[in-house]
């Protein structure tokens, strides 16, 4: 859940690791999501193809890939700082030796499906009394920016979104 003091000047959009910036093209962007760290980890897993196994029934090689999204809530209970984590985990089998383009498609599908489940989980009755971040538009758009910053080949999508400066 973002707060007013999370708003960051657009001139720092590509250098800060957290905060919110407003862009001309896409509206609010959450810089934490737009870093693409989860996409970077997923890309590495897809490139490495660890534990590839031949499956007779499919006449091909496959390897396991997992992806997750999580949130943490920090609370002080009886004077003790506690952090509670929850999230959504997805595991799939991916055919080995796919082209980089097909691996990017697999990654986007995996990230999008997991993000939808995670945002629904955040929006469930268990959490919506505490946080209003379920199906937060800036989170989903920011996840896409993070994806294209890692898997894309052109200019930085965050710069293409035209972050605004308030100075």
Model regions and ranges:
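Bulky hydrophobic segments
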Residues: 1-132, 150-167
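Divalent metal-coordination and catalytic microenvironments
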Residues: 139, 145
């Amino acid at each position: 859940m973002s707060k007013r003091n999370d708003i960051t000047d657009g001139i720092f959009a590509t250098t800060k690791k957290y905060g919110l910036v407003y862009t001309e093209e896409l509206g609010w962007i959450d810089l934490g999501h737009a870093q693409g760290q989860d996409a970077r980890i997923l890309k590495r897993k897809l490139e490495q193809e660890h534990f590839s196994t031949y499956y007779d029934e499919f006449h091909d090689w496959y390897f396991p890939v997992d992806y997750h999204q999580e949130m943490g809530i920090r609370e002080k209970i009886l004077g003790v700082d506690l952090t509670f984590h929850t999230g959504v985990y997805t595991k799939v089998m991916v055919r080995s030796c796919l082209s980089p383009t097909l691996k990017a498609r697999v990654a986007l599908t995996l990230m999008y499906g997991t993000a939808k489940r995670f945002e629904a989980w955040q929006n469930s009755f268990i959490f919506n009394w505490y946080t209003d971040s379920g199906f937060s538009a800036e989170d989903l758009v920011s996840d896409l920016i993070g994806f294209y910053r890692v898997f894309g080949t052109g200019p930085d999508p965050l710069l293409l979104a035209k972050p605004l400066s308030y100075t």
